[in-house]
Amino acid sequence: MPAPEIALRLLGGAEAAGSGEDVSALRAEVCGAPPHRDSTSRDSAGKDGASRDGADGGFGRRFGRQRRQPGFVLAEARHGGYLVGYAFGVPLRPATSWWRDLTAPLPEDLTAEHPGRTFALAELTVRAAWRRQGIGRDLHDLILDGRAEDRATAAIPVAAVPAQGAYQRWGWRKAARRHAEPPGTALLDVLLLDLAAGT
């Protein structure tokens, strides 16, 4: 359960439009420091992320594109009106680029996508001062509980040791490793979580 002063809510794409600036600001704060500084998000629904230009590295435009995709969902944690954490994701489409640029190939039966197979947890971020209070786990559970997909996937920087540990405790397993965008900047572990088993 979240701390009493934290309000959690789940938003669809249209509702998430009003949270774009808050999400961009929090992401810039958290991702401006290692191990996140040199890795950009790939558009989990099929297109590679834009180049890192502008104050937010193009994130605002990517977030705007992603929130318009079918099935997009944003989970927020707020203290009063102040955003302290968020998670968002979309279902993968058959033409996704999610499984490209792996450091080693995977079997096609693992990487082939069809509607309803995989939900991509594109980002989960908690403001530094609010960590270790269970907010990350609450956001994780809020966005994934009740999903219709068979599994979820996430890509976590190899150097993000605390995040790696959290995902492992939450039942995720490593499936592959891939390069972040732009190429040569960082390595990401591609993780999977079986949703059909209720874990």
Could you tell me what each predicted segment is?
Residues R137-D138, R151, V158-T185:
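Conserved active-site alpha-helix within GNAT-family acetyltransferase domains
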Residues F119, D145-A159:
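Conserved GNAT acetyl-CoA-binding A-motif
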Residues M1-E21, A25, E29:
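Conserved N-terminal entry element of GNAT/NAT acetyltransferase domains
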Residues C31-D43, D48-L74, R78-G80, V84, ...:
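Active-site rim helix/loop that mediates acceptor-substrate recognition in acyltransferases
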Residues G71-E76, Y86, T118, E123, ...:
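Short hydrophobic/aromatic beta-strand element in the GNAT-like acyltransferase core
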Residues L121-A128, R132-D145, Q168-R169:
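Conserved acetyl-CoA-binding loop-helix of GNAT-fold acetyltransferases
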Residues F88-E123, P182-G184:
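Conserved acyl-donor/pantetheine-binding loop and adjacent beta-alpha core of acyl/acetyltransferases
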